[in-house]
Amino acid sequence: MSQLTTVARPYAKAAFDFALEQGQLDKWQEMLQFSALVAENEDVQHFIHSSSAATQVADTFIAICGDQLDQYGQNFIRVMAENKRLSALPSVFASFNQIRAEYESVKDVFVTSATPLTKAQEDKIAKAMKQKLNSEVRITTSIDASLIAGVIIRYDDVVIDGSSRGQLNRLSQELCL
C-alpha cells in the first residue's frame, strides 16, 4: 500500500496543480473519484494487468469512463496507462484529496462512536476540534458497538480515546501492574 502511495503522490500533485491552475478542483476531484472506482473493479483490474498495449488499455479505460472525463482527464489516464500506473488510481484519488485538504487547511477528523451520533453531537465535536486544531475540520463518523459508550477521535497521528472500552482497558492495565 505504501508503495502505491509513493507512486500516486506525484500524479496526484500534478493533477492538483493543474486543477488549481484551471480553477477546476471540484471537476478533477469528481473525475479522479470516478476513475478510481472504475480502477477498483475486479474485471478492469484484470484487464489492466493482463494487457500489454498501453494505448489499448487507455482507450478501453476512457471508453468505460465515458463523459465522466474531459480531454485533460483523458490525457491524464493515457499518461498513467503508458507508465502502467492505472492500478494506482485509488491512491491517486486519496492523495489528491489529502493535498486538497492541506491546501484548503482542512483537517480530517475520524470519530468512532458506540452508537450513531446526532447532528448536534457531530457539530459539537466539529466545533471543539476546529478550535483545538485551529483549522477547518472534516468529520467522518463510524460506529463500533464494542466501544460500549463514548467516542474515539483520530486526526493526524493523534488518538483521543474517550470510550468506555478504553477506560476499562486502562483500568485493567493499572490493576495488573
From Swiss-Prot:
<keyword id="KW-0066">ATP synthesis</keyword>
<keyword id="KW-1003">Cell membrane</keyword>
<keyword id="KW-0472">Membrane</keyword>
<keyword id="KW-0139">CF(1)</keyword>
<protein>
    <recommendedName>
        <fullName>ATP synthase subunit delta</fullName>
    </recommendedName>
</protein>
<dbReference type="GO" id="GO:0005886">
    <property type="term" value="C:plasma membrane"/>
</dbReference>
<comment type="function">
    <text>This protein is part of the stalk that links CF(0) to CF(1). It either transmits conformational changes from CF(0) to CF(1) or is implicated in proton conduction.</text>
</comment>
<keyword id="KW-0997">Cell inner membrane</keyword>
<comment type="subunit">
    <text>F-type ATPases have 2 components, F(1) - the catalytic core - and F(0) - the membrane proton channel. F(1) has five subunits: alpha(3), beta(3), gamma(1), delta(1), epsilon(1). F(0) has three main subunits: a(1), b(2) and c(10-14). The alpha and beta chains form an alternating ring which encloses part of the gamma chain. F(1) is attached to F(0) by a central stalk formed by the gamma and epsilon chains, while a peripheral stalk is formed by the delta and b chains.</text>
</comment>
<keyword id="KW-0375">Hydrogen ion transport</keyword>
<dbReference type="InterPro" id="IPR026015">
    <property type="entry name" value="ATP_synth_OSCP/delta_N_sf"/>
</dbReference>
<dbReference type="GO" id="GO:0045259">
    <property type="term" value="C:proton-transporting ATP synthase complex"/>
</dbReference>
<dbReference type="Pfam" id="PF00213">
    <property type="entry name" value="OSCP"/>
</dbReference>
<comment type="similarity">
    <text>Belongs to the ATPase delta chain family.</text>
</comment>
<dbReference type="GO" id="GO:0046933">
    <property type="term" value="F:proton-transporting ATP synthase activity, rotational mechanism"/>
</dbReference>
<dbReference type="InterPro" id="IPR000711">
    <property type="entry name" value="ATPase_OSCP/dsu"/>
</dbReference>
<comment type="function">
    <text>F(1)F(0) ATP synthase produces ATP from ADP in the presence of a proton or sodium gradient. F-type ATPases consist of two structural domains, F(1) containing the extramembraneous catalytic core and F(0) containing the membrane proton channel, linked together by a central stalk and a peripheral stalk. During catalysis, ATP synthesis in the catalytic domain of F(1) is coupled via a rotary mechanism of the central stalk subunits to proton translocation.</text>
</comment>
<keyword id="KW-0406">Ion transport</keyword>
<keyword id="KW-0813">Transport</keyword>
